[in-house]
Amino acid sequence: MPLSRLIINDFRNIETCDIQLSTGFNFVIGPNGSGKTSVLEAIYLLGHGRSFKSSLTGRIIRNSCDELFIHGRFTTPEQFELPIGINKQRDGTTEVKIGGESGQKLAQLAKVLPLQLIHPEGFELVTDGPKFRRAFIDWGVFHVEPAFYEAWSRVKRLTKQRNALLKTAQSYRELSYWDLELANLAEKIDQWRVDYINHISEATQQICQAFLPEYDIKLSYYRGWERETPYAELLKRNFERDKQLGYTVGGPNKADLRIKVAGTPVEDVLSRGQLKLMVCALRLAQGQHLTEATGKQCIYLIDDFASELDSHRRQLLAQYLKQTKAQVFISSITAEQIADMHDEESKMFEIEHGKIAQG
């Protein structure tokens, strides 16, 4: 479901822009500091309700302005155009509109506009803590399992409530009622995650064979507690330890995706360029599975396309992106870096000092 139009007002250094988009490749070209990343960041904000660069709303609103607006129109599978929009104010107030209706939730926005981001800081997916890989898994499950969002939200609330009760409970009996619901939901979420990783593992390995043929890369899922123990049993068994620590040690909030080469974590084996291709393989596999499972297409946002990639690797990535037939937004410092990807169906936009013009 590609975006056909993008309107940005008072976001970063962009005062205003209104551009018609290609359903294929869209290139944003400009020198460092010109605002090219801000265009991708605005699209990300439209789909996630937050920036991938800053958690502080005040930093993404243009200087001297009180609020920002991002509007888009995307084409539905039935070929209707649906307007979506987000407004953020300096006090943190956020308003989301879908189809002209206010009061929509950010989760609904994410469901409408599935985005995949590949950017220079994206190595965190494979090099940093488990929370990044949990977010990766849960993005995928969220988009293919309708009941996931409500179940996961409930698990987080129950875990928070349990941690509070651990500080005052005198016996496990005081937690047992809540733990029954928590355990049932945790097992359900775990099974959804297992199924999801099973689905994307083969696609990830196939793409890795093209990107990194010299390595045999394996994915394995850790659910957050030992496989042979039911979660209800674990909660009861660990009550005294959890009470002493003041929080719940194991559970679905500790899940991880382990990515290894011959038993060694990939971050200890691959170069930075190879790690970027590994991240790209994971993102492409997610997008492929989303299309197979739901018929929806991801929108790919690739910031600083040439970063860490030589010409050969850029061509490999471009080839796979074209095969997806998805809408793609790519930022680059020069047009030469993406010259072999530009065709008659793509669009090129040049940006300088926050001013955007079609090239």
UniProtKB/Swiss-Prot annotation:
Checking PROSITE patterns in the record gives: RECF_1 (PS00617), RECF_2 (PS00618)
What biological processes does GO assign it? DNA replication; DNA synthesis involved in DNA repair; double-strand break repair; SOS response
InterPro entries reported for this sequence: DNA-binding_RecF, DNA-binding_RecF_CS, P-loop_NTPase, RecF/RecN/SMC_N, RecF_2
Major place of residence: cytoplasm
Pfam families assigned to the protein according to its UniProt record, in alphabetical order: SMC_N (PF02463)
List membrane-spanning regions. none
What keywords are annotated for this sequence in UniProt? Answer: ATP-binding, Cytoplasm, DNA damage, DNA repair, DNA replication, DNA-binding, Nucleotide-binding, SOS response
* Keyword Oxidoreductase tagged: no
Compartments annotated for it: namely: Cytoplasm
Matching entries from PANTHER family are given as:
DNA REPLICATION AND REPAIR PROTEIN RECF
Q: Which family does it belong to?
A: Belongs to the RecF family.
The protein's job, in short, is: The RecF protein is involved in DNA metabolism; it is required for DNA replication and normal SOS inducibility. RecF binds preferentially to single-stranded, linear DNA. It also seems to bind ATP.
Task: Quote the protein name from its UniProt record.
Answer: DNA replication and repair protein RecF
What is the organism of origin for this protein? Answer: Aliivibrio salmonicida (strain LFI1238)
